[in-house]
Amino acid sequence: KVKQSSYHLAWLVELFVHSTDINDEVPIHRWKIFVDAHNGDILDKFDQVRTATVSGQVTGSVKDEPYGLAQTRPMPHVKIDVSGVGSTYTDEEGFYSIDIGNQSRNVTVKLEGAYLNTNNANGSDASITRSVDPGTTEDFSFGSLNSTSGERDTYYHANIIHDHAKSIHSGLTGADYVMPARVNIGSEDSYWPCNAYWDYTGINMFSEGGGCAGTDEM
């Protein structure tokens, strides 16, 4: 049976709502409400805000010197990989946002980004993988449980140097590529310890030894 259409004289009311409830996963709403012009009944309503994105910040525990105090700092230009969707990058303050559709996805974050890819020469590379839902905030933090201090320090400071150089002259493009950064290199390398070098492609940083602090933490 075909349902017959009916018409109502109605008011269209638009409401922009910003919730102050810290537990509200979607704090912003933009409602369209159709109100019967004769009796005030609500005929229909819908929220124009769509919760198809996931956003958050990537941070890491970083030092300014080998024996200094570590602080939580934003990780810039980190690549955010989303299964079945693609990738995006954090900004200079470590924030990201990406549309993931209407289903849960696996997100993988490494200390790899637009300008640097850190590789642990004597262990597993820093990596975090987590299932995320649309419309949620997902922060990722690199610390001692998922990375080495050399990976974190090298990634952070190399990116800071890159961005500082670009701020002086935007035409400096020689480092605008994903530079390999080998860290935690040990005695398997004949140049170890107390050393670091550039091999015309990437940087190589050594672990602690021989009375020297790790150059990947300097």
Regions found by a protein language model. Give the residues of each.
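Extracytoplasmic/periplasmic, Sec-exported soluble proteins
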Residues: 5, 27, 146-157, 213-216
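Structured interaction patches on ligand/partner-binding surfaces of diverse proteins
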Residues: 116-139
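Surface-exposed loop/turn motifs at beta-strand-loop junctions within extracellular Ig-like
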Residues: 17, 111-115
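Segments that shape or occlude catalytic/ligand-binding pockets
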Residues: 1-74, 81-89, 173-202
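Glycine-centered loop/turn motifs
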Residues: 75-82, 104, 135-137
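Glycine-centered loop-to-beta-strand initiation motif
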Residues: 56, 84-111, 122-126, 140
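Zn2+-dependent metallopeptidase catalytic core
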Residues: 93, 97, 142-179
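Short pre-active-site segment immediately N-terminal to the catalytic Zn-binding motif
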Residues: 205-218
